[in-house]
Amino acid sequence: MSLPARYYTKTFEDNGATIRILWVDTAPMIDKYRNESETYPDACKQDYQQQLSWIDSVLTAAKEDWVIVAGHHPIYAETPKDESERADMQARLDPILRKHKVDMYICGHIHNFQHVRVAGSDIDYITNSAGSLARKVKPIEGTVFCSPEPGFSIVSASKKTLELRMIDKKGNVLHTVTRSK
C-alpha cells in the first residue's frame, strides 16, 4: 500500500463526530534536511512553502468537529536531537496550526511518549512512541506527561470529546489526553 501523496488530508466519522486529519511531510520544512541533499535527497526537492500554503488553505476550509495534524518531526518535545529541527518547525508550521486552532499535532521521530502544552497555544503536542526501540525522556517546560515505554496511541471522538490514549506494549493505558467542547 502506498500513500496517496507526500501530504494529504482525510475526514473520518466516529460516533457522530467528524475528524479531519492532515498528514504533512515535515522533512522539507527543516533546513538541516534540505541543506544535506546527499543524505536527504528528497527533502531538497520539495517546495515546503507550497505545502504550508496547502495546509493553510485546507485548515481555512475545515468545518469538522476536530482537526488533527500529523507529521514525522516534533514541534515541541524533549529530545537530544538537533534543536534546529524544532526551531524550524516552530517558525514554519506552528503559526499555521495556532492560527487555525488545531486540536492536536501528533508526531514520532524521537521514540517515546510525550504530551506537551505550551504557553499561548491551545494545541496538544503529542509525540507517539515506537513499537520497538524507545528512548529515554525527561520533562521540559510544558510537559504534561512523558514516558520512555514503547507502545502506540489510539484516538477516538464524539461530538463533545476528542481522546488520545497512550498505550504501552502490554496494553496498559499510560496517559489519556482529553479535549472537550
Segments (PLM) and residue ranges:
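Residue-level signal for glycine
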Residues: 171-173
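Short, well-ordered beta-to-alpha junction loops that form the rim of enzyme active sites
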Residues: 26, 70-74, 109-110, 167
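Extended active-site neighborhood of metal-dependent phosphoesterases/phosphodiesterases
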Residues: 1-63, 83-88, 92-104, 112-162
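Short acidic, glycine-rich surface-loop motifs adjacent to enzyme active sites
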Residues: 62-79
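C-terminal domain-closing interface element
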Residues: 158, 167-168
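Structural detector of well-ordered beta-strand residues that form the stable sheet scaffold
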Residues: 68-70, 106, 126
